[in-house]
């Protein structure tokens, strides 16, 4: 796969990924960002030429995206569906239900090691913000929540998480990039929310757990606005390149 001048998905996150997964990650970002609009028909031949790969990894990528319901495979090509505000809200609904369940399980578990691991990740999030690295912050943010989910060793909860992760990760990445440029001061609130998560887990305070969950998941409109900002910035950048 050739190095494109405008890859949206961080290359360093793909060191062990197959070519098909690499293409899927990039196309997913372009679709969620709005660079590839809903209704667009994706051609295997054109994508193969753009990414300098054979059609086989393109087919793999399109199957992945179809399983995530952001494209629809048809005879004339893959039709882009995209991601609506309603669907973004539904992703956070599922996360709220899932992480509430995980928190309930943690109330009966030894959480010392988990608290230590989460504290380390939080420090990395703080460093990322200090150096204004939205990509690393997004990586650590996803890792923070994944560490919580994995801690209860529940195979079906983990399966749900893994199914949500690709779209969720792309959405978070785009949102955090926009937030870094337009609402940098808001990262302090995000860090405080994660501090609250750790405190809730450590103390096993159910009310604090619910408060931390709702503070993180209730502001879906704000997250959608961040994505909208990201789309505007990317569109502006594309216009400048074409001038």
Curated annotation (Swiss-Prot):
Name the DNA-binding stretches: 44-63
What the entry lists under Gene3D superfamilies is as follows: GntR ligand-binding domain-like (1.20.120.530), Winged helix-like DNA-binding domain superfamily/Winged helix DNA-binding domain (1.10.10.10)
Q: Short name of one Pfam family for this protein? A: GntR
InterPro entries listed in its UniProt record: GntR_C (IPR011711), TF_FadR/GntR_C (IPR008920), Tscrpt_reg_HTH_GntR (IPR000524), WH-like_DNA-bd_sf (IPR036388), WH_DNA-bd_sf (IPR036390)
One GO biological process term: D-gluconate metabolic process
Q: Tell whether Transcription regulation is among the UniProt keywords.
A: yes
Provide the alphabetized UniProt keywords: DNA-binding, Gluconate utilization, Repressor, Transcription, Transcription regulation
The organism's superkingdom is given as Bacteria
Q: List residues of the HTH gntR-type domain.
A: 17-83
GO function term, MF aspect, one: DNA binding
Q: What does this protein do?
A: Transcriptional repressor of the gluconate operon (gntRKPZ), which encodes the proteins for gluconate utilization. Represses mRNA synthesis by binding to the gnt operator; the binding is suppressed by gluconate or glucono-delta-lactone.
Q: Which PANTHER family match?
A: GLUCONATE OPERON TRANSCRIPTIONAL REPRESSOR, TRANSCRIPTIONAL REGULATOR, GNTR FAMILY
Protein name per its UniProtKB record: Gluconate operon transcriptional repressor
> What organism is listed for this UniProt entry?
Bacillus licheniformis
Q: Which gene encodes it?
A: gntR
């Amino acid at each position: 796969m050739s190095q494109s001048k405008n890859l949206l998905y961080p290359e360093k996150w793909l060191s062990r990924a197959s070519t098909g997964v690499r293409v899927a990650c990039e196309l997913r970002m372009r679709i969620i960002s709005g660079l590839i609009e809903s209704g667009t028909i994706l051609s295997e031949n054109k994508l193969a030429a753009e990414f300098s790969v054979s059609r086989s990894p393109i087919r793999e990528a399109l199957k992945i995206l179809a399983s995530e319901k952001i494209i629809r495979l048809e005879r004339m090509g893959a039709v882009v569906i995209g991601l609506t505000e309603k669907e973004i809200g539904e992703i956070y609904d599922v996360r709220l239900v899932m992480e509430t369940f995980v928190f309930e399980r943690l109330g009966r578990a030894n959480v010392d090691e988990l608290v230590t691991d989460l504290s380390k990740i939080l420090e990395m999030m703080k460093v990322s913000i200090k150096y204004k690295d939205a990509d690393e912050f997004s990586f650590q943010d996803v890792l923070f929540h994944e560490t919580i989910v994995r801690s209860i060793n529940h195979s079906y909860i983990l399966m749900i998480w893994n199914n949500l992760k690709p779209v969720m990760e792309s959405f978070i990445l785009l949102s955090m990039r926009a937030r870094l440029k337009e609402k940098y001061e808001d990262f302090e609130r995000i860090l405080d929310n994660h501090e609250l998560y750790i405190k809730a887990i450590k103390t096993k305070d159910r009310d604090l757990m619910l408060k931390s969950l709702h503070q993180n998941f209730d502001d879906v409109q704000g997250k959608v606005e961040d994505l909208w900002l990201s789309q505007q910035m990317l569109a502006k950048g594309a216009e400048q390149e074409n001038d």
